[in-house]
Curated annotation (Swiss-Prot):
Contains 2 disulfide bonds. Belongs to the scoloptoxin-04 family. It comes from Scolopendra morsitans (Tanzanian blue ringleg centipede). The keyword Cytoplasm does not apply. One of its GO terms (molecular function) is toxin activity. Expressed by the venom gland. One of its GO terms (cellular component) is extracellular region. Its main location: secreted. Transmembrane segments: none annotated. It is found in: Secreted. This is U-scoloptoxin(04)-Sm2a.
Length: 66
């Protein structure tokens, strides 16, 4: 009986940590910095040249075909 009580207390202590990873909001927080890095690497306004026949759109920060 004492073991069940200890396990239930441990589970209640771990619940906020586990729920942070279970929600989509928490998962999005972990993925978001990776997406920001990719946008910055492909950002043509920071010195990356666009291929021939493309132009740099400063609003989208991407190379677009002409």
């Amino acid at each position: 009986m004492k073991a069940i009580y200890i396990l239930s207390v441990l589970l209640l202590m771990m619940l906020p940590i586990l729920s942070r990873f279970a929600t989509s909001e928490g998962a999005a927080q972990h993925v978001e910095p990776i997406q920001k890095i990719r946008v910055e690497q492909n950002d043509c306004t920071r010195g990356i040249r666009c291929p021939r026949g493309h132009y740099c759109d400063p609003g989208l920060r991407q190379c677009l075909p002409r």
